[in-house]
Regions:
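Non-catalytic accessory segments flanking enzyme active sites
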Residues: 4, 66, 73, 85-175
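Residue-level recognition of a conserved intra-blade site in WD40 beta-propeller repeats
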Residues: 56-58, 100
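Short loop/turn segments that connect beta-strands within beta-propeller blades
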Residues: 34-38, 79-83, 124-128
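A flexible loop/linker signature enriched in serine peptidases of the S9 family
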Residues: 3-31, 42-51, 65-76, 91-93, ...
């Protein structure tokens, strides 16, 4: 049985912080419970992103889930037997929802990136290939978008905060612009 909860649930077996520290209560983790022995094993204790939507595929016996990965929401595959997690290669930065096929090795998802609207894809999980099925970007045809660039900041503790900034359309580096934070 697949369980989801905070690091402190189930007696704190998902905690991955120093003794005396309290883990984040919005950091959802995955656990596997053996029904016969009632033993529970943390599957994502050392996995940094916060686990979000989760589906166990009956076709390949893998768990597919989305997770907050820096400033994106990525799609991941967990093989419970091997305790292996890998990122599923998809063409969008934000996977907003997905559904796994019941009898085929595929899933559908919708997502978006910094400079496009929602798009719907079908992913062949054996080939690790995405096929675009629906593109709502046409809804933005009259909207002029500027460029989006990655921007990382290192705080005083040495933590890297990943972010991005957006330049206005027709950006001229010789002009001054207000910054909206």
């Amino acid at each position: 049985v697949l369980l989801a909860g905070t690091p402190e649930c189930l007696g704190g077996i998902g905690k991955n912080v120093k003794e005396g520290q309290t883990p984040s209560m919005i950091d959802n983790q995955l656990y596997l419970m053996d029904l016969q022995s009632k033993q529970i094993e943390p599957l994502t204790r050392t996995f940094n992103p916060n686990v979000m939507q989760t589906v166990w595929s009956a076709v390949d016996n893998c768990v597919y889930f989305t997770a907050e990965d820096r400033d994106c929401i990525a799609l991941f595959r967990l093989n419970p037997a091997k305790k292996h997690i890998e990122k599923v290669n998809v063409p969008e930065e934000m996977v907003l929802g997905f559904s796994v096929a019941e009898k085929a090795s595929s899933l559908s998802f919708y997502g978006e990136s910094a400079s496009n609207s929602h798009r719907l894809y079908v992913v062949d999980l054996k080939k690790d290939a995405s096929k675009l099925e629906e593109d709502l970007n046409g809804e933005l045809k009259d909207v002029l978008l500027g460029e989006c660039k990655a921007w990382d900041f290192v705080n005083s503790r040495g933590d890297t905060i990943c972010g991005r900034y957006y330049l206005p359309p027709h950006f001229d580096p010789n002009k001054k612009y207000p910054m909206i934070v």
